[in-house]
């Protein structure tokens, strides 16, 4: 992934995030991602997710795409005791590893994991959510927005990672399916009058959309 910010700025933000919260479990999850080239949001974006969730008093979070629980770690910190984070991932191994990590971090009681298709898992849940977070395969982003936008409470948030796609969304010559899907997704979010949205150019771009109507 190409960096959107200068490397020195990226490292500065990471150092600040590390100084705010340290956890050997988090270190282990990050080391695994680095060793196996597994995509995680990283500590600076993780901190952003936690801040966003705390800022609206989120108690119920739906994740569309969870991997082995890295982003769920941050949301679970935010929702507090009695809050819930519903995770989805197609791989049973990821679900088992998420449980192992989050149990050690003391957060597993706030998490439920659905193995299988993210949107099918979402459809099986009842009611609205304070936050829906999207980090599935990029060609699925438009459908995730269409589903999520209907089930976020007034004052709730839609959050989505990788929406700048290493800058490829701004390259007209790039016609890859994943790039075009993210462009469509971003236009759909921006055009929805029920939401006020912006993209934070942190790491690979984070869509932040607040439901106002």
Description of each model-found segment:
Residues 1-131, 138-159, 163-213:
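A short alpha-helical cap/connector motif
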């Amino acid at each position: 992934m190409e960096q959107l910010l200068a490397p020195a700025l990226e490292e500065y933000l990471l150092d600040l995030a590390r100084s705010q919260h340290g956890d050997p479990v988090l270190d282990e999850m990050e080391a695994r991602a680095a060793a196996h080239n597994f995509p995680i949001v990283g500590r600076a974006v993780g901190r952003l997710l936690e801040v966003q969730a705390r800022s609206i008093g989120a108690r119920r979070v739906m994740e569309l795409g969870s991997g082995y629980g890295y982003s769920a770690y941050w949301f679970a910190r935010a929702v507090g005791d009695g809050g819930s984070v519903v995770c989805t991932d197609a791989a049973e191994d990821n679900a088992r590893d998420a449980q192992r990590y989050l149990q050690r971090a003391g957060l597993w009681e706030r998490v439920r994991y659905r193995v299988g298709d993210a949107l099918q898992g979402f459809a099986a849940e009842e009611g609205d959510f304070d936050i829906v977070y999207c980090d599935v395969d990029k060609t699925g982003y438009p459908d995730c927005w269409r589903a999520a936008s209907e089930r976020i409470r007034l004052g709730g948030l839609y959050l989505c990672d990788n929406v700048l796609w290493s800058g490829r969304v701004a390259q007209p010559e790039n016609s890859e399916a994943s790039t075009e899907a993210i462009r469509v997704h971003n236009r759909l979010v921006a055009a929805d009058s029920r939401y006020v949205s912006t993209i934070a150019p942190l790491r690979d771009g984070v869509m932040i959309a607040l439901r106002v109507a």
